[in-house]
Each structure stands twice: as C-alpha cells, then as structure tokens.
Amino acid sequence: MENIEKKEIRPLYIRERVAVYVYCYSYKGTRQLSRFGDIVYSSQKSHYSLLYVNNDEVADLLNKLKELRFVKKVRVGHIKELDQNFSEAFIQTNLEVKEELEH
C-alpha cells in the first residue's frame, strides 16, 4: 500500500446546460436532433422534443435548428431565470393555513 503513488485529482467542471424545445411538423425528424444535443424527451403525439445543450452553444444551435426543414419552431427553457427558493412560499402557505384553522 505504501508503493502507491498519489496522483493529483483534477477538479470536475460542470458545464451549464439549457433546455431547448424543438417543435416539428412530423415525428420523423426527431432522430436527427440527436446531432445537436442530448434528447431527453420526445413526444410522438405533440411532435416536440426536449434537448439539453451547452449554454455557450445555444445561439449557434438555435439558428441551425430553425434552418431545418422539419422544424416548426424552437423555444429555450426559462428555468434559470426563475427563483427556485421556495422556503418563503412554504412559510407563507403555513401561515395562511394556521389563520384559517384559527377562525
């Protein structure tokens, strides 16, 4: 055990990802979308797919996706813009419930 060399551990860099919703005219073209990002979900009935793409590549990819013949429209997810701290909402809800129970 003493002969094992200690190697430097490199830090793990997590790249920011963005959700991109791609609406298509038909379901046939959704297979081709895997070239542009990771397909997380695709709906046959609603003809849309959810891709996750690196944040720094979004602007170029949106233009490329819009140029495809089978793509109807492209939307970017807004989860990064939303406040995800729900503790204040829970406190407010608890206070409202307590007030209703007291009356």
UniProtKB/Swiss-Prot annotation:
Top-rank taxon: Bacteria
GO terms for CC? Answer: cytoplasm
Q: Where in the cell is it found?
A: Cytoplasm
Establish whether keyword Transport is in the entry. no
InterPro entries from the entry?
DUF2129 (IPR016979)
Q: Is Cytoplasm given among the entry's keywords?
A: yes
Print the keywords alphabetically: Cytoplasm
User: What family classification does the UniProt entry report for this protein?
Assistant: Belongs to the UPF0298 family.
**Protein name according to UniProt:** UPF0298 protein LACR_0404
